[in-house]
Regions:
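Dual-mode signal for accessory low-complexity, basic/Gly-rich regions
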Residues: 130-291
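Active-site bordering "gate/hinge" segments
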Residues: 1-143, 167, 280-291
Length: 291
């Protein structure tokens, strides 16, 4: 992928690890397993029309060369566009497209709110059988599965994939032994990876109407308590119905609890160590601070 004169990978680092885990306790738990992982980082650089560098990281349970090649190609294109971007988008409300890691982080709200650790202290009002997106969903209803990336939890609980949300309905509460017993539910262990089985619209279809697609934030944040998400725009593509313009600066501010009824997901997919699902999500009327 590093074949362009104007944009290139200027440095990279790969780490491969093998971890042996053994779990014992006074209740008779005696289990062990080994796990391999691949992670790393690289920096892409574009020299003209301005010198710009951008950092990328990656992590997989097994090396996914196809996904890594795609990420590298996208990173090279993004750093070229960032070097060409000179203005922030105008202040206003936009049809917003978020993709990749940002979409993964958004799904963290539902995973967090469905955990016994959040429900028992009263931080989350989730209950089994509730409609997590409300009763009047105009977009897609969520289908979210917790993926067991390890055979046992840190407490020695056998891990298995769990259907967390099906057609927008919370199917179960999950968590550690302590908080699960407090709530009277079966302990499952905690999960890091999710699979999202949604997607009704191709990414190309999403881009036919005017949009703002933020592909890089300076620091994207998702608050599972309040539902607010956002961050400063490092690079976004603005389509006005005729032309696509790279923009930089300004910030996005939205609330997933207010926007979740209208979510539409792409049929195009994205996968990393902790997420497997649609590449992009479409929101309507999201506030953007700009020039």
């Amino acid at each position: 992928m590093d074949v362009n004169e104007d944009a290139f990978i200027n440095s990279s680092e790969f780490l491969m690890s093998k971890t042996n885990t053994a779990i014992y306790n006074s209740e008779g738990v005696d289990v062990s397993y080994e796990k391999y992982s691949v992670s790393g980082e690289f920096v892409v650089q574009c020299l003209t029309p301005q010198d710009v560098e951008q950092y990328q990281d990656f992590a997989y349970d097994d090396l996914d060369t196809e996904a890594l090649a795609t990420q590298a190609a996208q990173a090279l294109e993004m750093v070229r566009m960032r070097a060409a971007a000179t203005e922030a988008p105008e202040k206003g409300n936009y049809r917003l497209l978020l993709s990749g890691k940002e979409l993964r982080d958004l799904m963290g709200l539902y995973v967090s709110r469905a955990s016994a650790q959040m429900i028992y202290p009263g931080y989350s009002a989730y209950k089994k059988g509730m409609q997590v997106q409300g009763d009047e969903v105009k977009g897609e209803k969520l289908n979210l599965t917790l993926h067991a990336s390890e055979p046992y939890s840190g407490e020695g609980i056998p891990m298995k994939d769990l259907q967390l949300i099906q057609n927008g309905t919370l199917e179960r509460i999950y968590g550690t032994a302590r908080f699960s017993y407090y709530l009277g539910v079966e302990p499952t262990g905690t999960y890091k990876a999710v699979k999202l089985d949604n997607g009704t619209k191709s990414f190309d279809e999403m881009k036919k109407a005017p949009y703002l697609h933020v592909v890089s934030f300076s620091d994207f944040s998702m608050d599972s308590f309040s539902g607010y998400f956002g961050g400063e725009i490092r690079l976004a593509y603005l389509y006005d119905g005729e032309n696509v313009t790279p923009v930089t600066g300004g910030s996005v501010s939205g609330n997933l609890l207010e926007l979740q009824k209208d979510m539409v997901f792409s049929t195009d997919c994205y996968k990393d160590k902790n997420y497997d699902g649609p590449f992009a999500v479409e929101f309507q009327n999201v506030a953007v601070a700009g020039r």
